[in-house]
Amino acid sequence: MVITGGKHPTLMDMGQCRLSMGIVPLRREEVPPYTRILADSDMDGLFGAAVLKAFRPEATVMFSHAAALRGGLDDEHIDRNTVLVDLPFHPSCGWYVDHHLTNRPDQQEAAAFAAGGGTQHWESTPSAARLAYELLAEITEMEHLTPMMPVVDALDSGGISKETFLEDGPLLQLSRTCTSRDPVYMQHLVDLLAGGADFEALMADPVVSERCQRVKDERAAVQRHVEANTIIVDRLAVCRMDESGFRSNGYLVTAWAGDRADACCIVHGYADGDLSDADRPPLSASFYANSFLPGGQGRYDLSRMATALDSTGGGHVNACGCRVQPPGLDANMEHWLDMWANRETVLKI
């Protein structure tokens, strides 16, 4: 499932078919008012923001990430005129659109939010962008996005096959260009997508084309780093990317580990990093199930590891993350490895 070259019939066929998820599309008068869109700075957040801006072109778009929002860095930008997509819940927003299990407001939070005038749409869709897309599908012109949505879904839900990952098609490359470190570029992307750019127009854009070529070339260097800095401990691939400047999701590490690992833990960031510095963030850890294995997902709830030491950690059971907590990485890693060693009782779903 990948768009490559000039022809992509399989994905185009998939994209023309609306997913049946029981989501009731909104009527125009049912859409909550918003003037600002705050989205995660990954592929899912990008497409979620594009959908929301396609419906309301005059809305401004900002990109952030989960740790920044939970750390209070986005508070000044969140009010009842703000829609949050693909980010943790914030009670001050006006409309909340998400699909992460650990982000879902509990009953008390949801009731207080609704009583204060907020609107919540939380569903366990493959991506938050898919939820936004289905909600606005009947009142927004989005045919240009339709063929790309299956890749957005697959990337965010662990649905990329190993063959597709190794092929590294243009949309997979595009996903690696998404970053909170370059808000100008992210704004360029969302303007293209919200403005009607289809796959061909997107990939023909000089800025996008150059970024995709750059990450394509960089992948070999990241692969070498993974090979040199990953160990497998009791079927958990532990990859140290901290202090390197490199970043990766779980696909690259689990592809390297193959059938030797059921999951991976990737350490990113810097020991002296700061949450407000996108170029030098603090130490964090991400946990991913090996989705390339048959039945590799849904065996263990990795979000329990992400929330064990960091109350602001979380995500999905198969893909999640957290910040490293005092006294430091070594102690945190010891705790996570102990949980993993007892996974059949501590993490088993």
PLM feature spans:
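Accessory alpha-helical/coil subdomains and C-terminal extensions
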Residues: K162-A221
